[in-house]
A protein has these predicted regions:
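Transmembrane signal-anchor helices characteristic of membrane glycosylation enzymes that use polyprenol
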Residues: 2-55, 222-224
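Membrane-interface transmembrane helices that cradle and orient dolichyl/undecaprenyl
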Residues: 160-178
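Membrane-interface alpha helices of multi-pass inner-membrane proteins
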Residues: 178-202
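Short hydrophobic/aromatic helix or loop-helix immediately within or flanking a transmembrane segment
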Residues: 59-67, 73-98
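Alpha-helical transmembrane segments and terminal signal-anchor/GPI-anchor hydrophobic tails
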Residues: 52-63, 68-71, 196-263
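Transmembrane-helix motifs of polytopic, lipid-linked glycan transferases
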Residues: 106-126
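Membrane-embedded helix bundles of polyisoprenyl
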Residues: 132-153, 157-164
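Transmembrane-helix signature of polytopic, membrane-embedded enzymes
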Residues: 30-31, 119-142
Length: 263
C-alpha cells in the first residue's frame, strides 16, 4: 500500500508534468492543450495530498466540509461561508464523498489550466516561436506560486487566475461582455473579491477622464480612505466591525490590490 501511495504522490505527478513539458515542445496546436492538461493534472495530484497547517485557510475549508457531512443540501445557505453559495455547493458535494482532498485538487486543476491557457494565448498573440521560453515560464510560475500562494489561499487565487483569463479573452474580443459578466457572477459566488473584475469595464464605460482618474486613485489608495471613513463611523456599527480587521491586518486582504494592478 505504501508503494502505491508513493507512486501516486511522487512518480505520477512527475510523469504528468514531465510529459506535459515534452508535448509542449511539439509544433502542433493539440499538443499544446494536451501538455497543459497533463501539467495541471500533475499539480492537482500534488495538491490532493497537501495537508494544511491548523492556521491555514485550507484547514478552515476542511472544517466546513466536515460540518456539511450528514446534512441536507440546504445547509449551504445557512452554514459555511456567507453569500458564496457556489463554493458552498462544491464543498457540500465533496463532503458527501468524504474525500476532502478533491477540493484543492479540482481548484488547482481548473485554476492552473486557465493560467497556462492564458499564457498560451498571449504567447500565440505575440507570435513567439521559442518553446523553451514557454516551458521556462510555466515552470517558473509553478515554482513561485504553487504552495504558499495558491493552495493556501485557493479560492481567491483561483478567482484571480480565472478572471485574468476571461479579462484577456474580453480584451482580445474572444468573448462578449455579457459572457464575461456571467463568469464574474459565478466567480463572485466562489469568492466576493471577484467583483473587482468589473472595474476595467466600469473605467471604460466612464468617458470622463477626471472621473476615471478619481476612480483609480480611490482604488489604489483605498486603505487611507477607508481609515478616514472608519474614523467617522460609530465603533459598534456593522461597517466599523467589518472593516477594522482588514485595516488592522488581522484578516487577509484577499489580494484585491494584486488583481487591480494586474488589470
Amino acid at each position: 500500500m505504501s508503494n502505491i501511495l508513493f507512486g501516486v504522490c511522487i512518480i505520477l505527478p512527475v510523469l504528468c508534468i514531465g510529459s506535459g513539458c515534452y508535448f509542449i515542445r511539439q509544433e502542433q496546436k493539440k499538443c499544446d492543450i494536451l501538455s497543459i492538461v497533463l501539467i495541471s493534472v500533475g499539480l492537482a495530484l500534488i495538491a490532493f495530498y497537501t495537508l494544511p497547517n491548523t492556521s491555514d485557510d485550507l484547514q478552515r475549508h476542511f472544517d466546513v466540509m466536515r460540518s456539511y457531512q450528514n446534512h441536507s443540501i440546504m445547509v449551504i445557505f445557512h452554514s459555511g461561508y456567507s453569500l458564496v453559495y457556489l463554493n458552498n455547493l462544491i464543498m457540500y458535494i465533496i463532503a458527501q464523498t468524504n474525500i476532502l482532498g478533491l477540493y484543492q485538487a479540482i481548484f488547482t486543476f481548473v485554476g492552473y489550466f486557465y493560467l497556462f491557457k492564458l499564457i498560451l494565448m498571449i504567447y500565440d498573440d505575440l507570435k513567439i516561436r521559442n518553446k523553451n521560453i514557454l516551458i521556462g515560464m510555466l515552470l517558473f510560475i509553478f515554482c513561485m506560486s504553487f504552495y504558499k500562494t495558491y493552495i493556501l489561499a485557493i479560492r481567491n487565487y483561483f478567482c484571480f487566475i480565472t478572471g485574468a483569463y476571461y479579462c484577456y479573452a474580453l480584451r482580445t474580443e474572444r468573448i462578449r461582455v455579457h459572457h464575461f459578466l456571467i463568469v464574474v457572477l459565478l466567480l463572485s459566488l466562489i469568492h466576493p473579491v471577484s467583483l473587482v473584475l468589473v472595474i476595467p469595464l466600469l473605467v471604460d464605460w466612464i468617458k470622463n477622464r477626471k472621473i476615471q482618474f478619481a476612480l483609480l486613485v480611490g482604488i489604489f489608495f483605498h486603505y487611507p480612505i477607508l481609515k478616514f471613513f472608519l474614523s467617522l463611523c460609530p465603533k459598534d456599527s456593522f461597517v466599523y466591525l467589518k472593516i477594522l480587521p482588514y485595516l488592522n491586518g488581522t484578516i487577509q486582504p484577499y489580494n484585491a490590490n494584486y488583481m487591480i494592478l494586474f488589470m
